[in-house]
């Protein structure tokens, strides 16, 4: 879900007395929304809950988020997760850099994405 949408939903919930904490990867967007509590993970977008298939990192991320929820000293508190996507941060150099992909690879990825959307649409329409 969009970081901005989550941030705005959190502000609405907080205005009605429901405490929230956001787990996110887009620090600039979430902080701009002015959320009360935010656990920032310096991971690629879509991985706010920890590394894929890494239950330990996911559990640690959730534990940190709950800690932020119960102990944030003030509104608009941000805590940065100590977890790293990889040791040297090199993922940032390649993440979404289309200049590093051949036109064939871009077409292949687009085809894969379209196939996933087709499956999702069929499931949505079947329900």
Residue ranges of each PLM-predicted region?
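A short acidic, often aromatic-flanked loop/helix-cap motif at beta-alpha or helix-coil junctions
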Residues: 45-50, 86
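Surface-exposed loop/turn and secondary-structure junction residues enriched for glycine/proline
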Residues: 32-33, 48, 82
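Short, acidic/turn-prone active-site loops that include or flank metal/cofactor-
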Residues: 25-27, 43-46
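Extended, histidine- and acidic-residue-enriched regions that form the cofactor-binding/catalytic faces
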Residues: 67-127
């Amino acid at each position: 879900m969009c970081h901005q949408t989550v941030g705005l939903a959190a502000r609405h919930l907080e205005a009605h007395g429901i405490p929230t904490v956001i787990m996110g990867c887009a620090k600039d967007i979430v902080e701009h929304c002015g959320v009360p509590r935010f656990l920032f993970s310096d991971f690629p977008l879509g991985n706010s809950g920890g590394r894929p298939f890494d239950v330990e990192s996911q559990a640690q991320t959730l534990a940190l988020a709950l800690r932020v929820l119960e102990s944030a000293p003030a509104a608009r508190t941000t805590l940065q997760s100590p977890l790293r996507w990889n040791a040297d941060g090199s993922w940032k150099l390649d993440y979404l850099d289309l200049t590093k992909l051949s036109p064939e690879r871009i077409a292949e990825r687009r085809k894969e994405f379209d196939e996933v959307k087709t499956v999702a649409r069929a499931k949505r329409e079947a329900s």
